[in-house]
Amino acid sequence: MQKNAAHTYAISSLLVLSLTGCAWIPSTPLVQGATSAQPVPGPTPVANGSIFQSAQPINYGYQPLFEDRRPRNIGDTLTIVLQENVSASKSSSANASRDGKTNFGFDTVPRYLQGVFGNARADVEASGGNTFNGKGGANASNTFSGTLTVTVDQVLVNGNLHVVGEKQIAINQGTEFIRFSGVVNPRTISGSNTVPSTQVADARIEYVGNGYINEAQNMGWLQRFFLNLSPM
């Protein structure tokens, strides 16, 4: 009875490991949450006959005469000019060597060792050496260019704008998604309502897709199974 229970436990454990190896690994999106924001409606003014009204209607289309039209409220749009060009390289090397040599001799050889050293003076010499050479290197580069219009979804207490946006492009039977989020200083916004991505704080840029091309880049369940079980 105990033998059958042991076999059952072993088979169950192997089945659990097999299912773990076949499990699909979900990808966590870099830009989370909604990718758009709607303007916040203002309070409704009450006609009480007074010149000063505590609740004034918000005119989102209002533009001062001597001021550029720049985003300042939730729901305003802003164009991000993607200019990401990052490269990094690293190399390392290590060398180590050690040599040793020892000489010693016997003027008199014991009788039971004469068959090994002979009857004459015995000289013994030992030497050894150890050498290690190691090298390593890594190179990485990333280039991303384009434009993406985002929406202000939060106005921070210091006046900075938190923006978020998404662009979807359908090509044949696949869809490409470009998502962006970050914090923009209004002073860096140009007169054409654009700001380079290099001047955006806490920037999150995500470029993903779905369809046959994206599925071809993913590892199959059988390959993941053998990869998890392989000791190499």
From Swiss-Prot:
GO terms for molecular function: cytoskeletal motor activity. It is a lipid-anchor. Residues 1-21 form the signal peptide. Disulfide bonds: none annotated. It is found in: Cell outer membrane; Bacterial flagellum basal body. InterPro entries: Flag_Lring. A lipid is attached at residue 22 (N-palmitoyl cysteine). A lipid is attached at residue 22 (S-diacylglycerol cysteine). PROSITE patterns: PROKAR_LIPOPROTEIN. GO terms for cellular component: bacterial-type flagellum basal body, distal rod, L ring; cell outer membrane. GO terms for biological process: bacterial-type flagellum-dependent cell motility. It comes from the Bacteria. Keywords: Bacterial flagellum, Cell outer membrane, Lipoprotein, Membrane, Palmitate, Signal. Assembles around the rod to form the L-ring and probably protects the motor/basal body from shearing forces during rotation. PANTHER family: FLAGELLAR L-RING PROTEIN. Belongs to the FlgH family. The basal body constitutes a major portion of the flagellar organelle and consists of four rings (L,P,S, and M) mounted on a central rod. This is Flagellar L-ring protein. The lineage of its organism: Bacteria, Pseudomonadati, Pseudomonadota, Gammaproteobacteria, Enterobacterales.
